[in-house]
Amino acid sequence: MANIKSAIKRVKTTEKAEARNISQKSAMRTAVKNAKTAVSNNADNKNELVSLAVKLVDKAAQSNLIHSNKADRIKSQLMTANK
């Protein structure tokens, strides 16, 4: 454990940020998974689920949780499957 006061603060903020990032990334993955299953099953609410997944993917890319190219690839796969 760190002894310096600023290092102790950084450990706390890093742990908070890590928890937030993990939660946001998990929510994004779940939304993408739900959208893909809705599209494959031709569900009634597939358009809503795809738009929610795209929104969460964009937010994850904006906060550098995933690379922007990966975000574009995921969105492209969702849109192609939803045609």
UniProtKB/Swiss-Prot annotation:
Record GO biological process: translation
Pfam families with a match to the protein in the record: Ribosomal_S20p
One GO MF term attached to the UniProt entry: structural constituent of ribosome
Keywords tagged on the record: Ribonucleoprotein, Ribosomal protein, RNA-binding, rRNA-binding
InterPro entries: Ribosomal_bS20 (IPR002583), Ribosomal_bS20_sf (IPR036510)
Domain of life assignment: Bacteria
SUPFAM superfamilies the record matches: Ribosomal protein S20 (SSF46992)
Gene Ontology cellular-component annotations: cytosol; small ribosomal subunit
Gene3D superfamilies: Ribosomal protein S20
Role noted for this protein: Binds directly to 16S ribosomal RNA.
UniProt similarity note: Belongs to the bacterial ribosomal protein bS20 family.
Protein name: Small ribosomal subunit protein bS20
Species of provenance: Staphylococcus aureus (strain NCTC 8325 / PS 47)
Taxonomic placement: Bacteria, Bacillati, Bacillota, Bacilli, Bacillales
Gene that encodes it: rpsT
